[in-house]
């Protein structure tokens, strides 16, 4: 049976209306039998996650069973996930990036969870459109805006086909534009996305830095 989404409203003590009893505006979902959906739920619109206790819809960046997930902040549809194996590949890339930087006297970059899920989402998008332009036609950095990530400087490296972190880093370091991003002194944070789609690997590096005041 198709589940139905709706916002739950209860009258507050002040006499006005608040979304949910606690006023948080969280969404819940009920199945055709009127039971609150909890846990994972998939329908024609996509995949969602509802809190196992309160049934509230996950939005934004959420850790579930030790894995990071990105859910649309408006609709709650899952946009990306980072499995343990994918994160291990991404972490190795970050390690190699920082080896390149520190060997040249540059500061190492800090792994940022928000950039990690943004990069994971971008990696999946590359399987639809291999470009710095997203499948919806917007530029790659709109995913940062959507997640509320503030930055003064930003960069993106993309790649496809390389089977290991060492190979993709070698290719990036032998490309002047990609190398410039990896060694950019203005960046201080990094997120790396890696995914396999139909047996084909896609890679993304996202960098951000603040303006010096």
Listing of model-derived features with the role each one plays in the protein:
Residues 117-166, 182-184:
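Short, surface-exposed glycine/acidic/tryptophan-bearing loops
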């Amino acid at each position: 049976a198709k589940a139905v989404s709706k916002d739950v409203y209860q009258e507050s003590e002040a006499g006005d209306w608040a979304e949910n009893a606690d006023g948080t505006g969280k969404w819940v979902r009920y199945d055709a039998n009127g039971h609150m959906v909890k846990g994972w739920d998939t329908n024609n619109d996509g995949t969602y996650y509802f809190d196992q206790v309160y049934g509230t819809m996950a939005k934004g960046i959420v850790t579930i069973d030790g894995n990071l997930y990105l859910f649309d902040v408006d609709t709650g549809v899952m946009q990306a996930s980072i499995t343990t194996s994918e994160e291990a590949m991404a972490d190795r890339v970050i390690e190699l990036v920082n080896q390149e930087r520190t060997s040249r006297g540059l500061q190492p970059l800090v792994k940022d969870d928000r950039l990690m899920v943004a990069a994971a989402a971008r990696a999946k998008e590359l399987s639809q459109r291999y470009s710095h332009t997203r499948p919806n036609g917007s530029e790659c950095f709109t995913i940062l805006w959507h997640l509320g990530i503030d930055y003064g400087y930003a960069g993106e490296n993309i790649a496809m086909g390389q089977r290991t972190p060492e190979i993709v880093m070698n290719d990036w370091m032998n490309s002047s534009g990609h190398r410039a991003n990896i060694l950019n002194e203005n960046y201080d944070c990094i997120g790396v996305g890696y995914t396999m789609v139909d047996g084909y690997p896609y890679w993304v590096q996202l960098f951000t830095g603040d303006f010096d005041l």
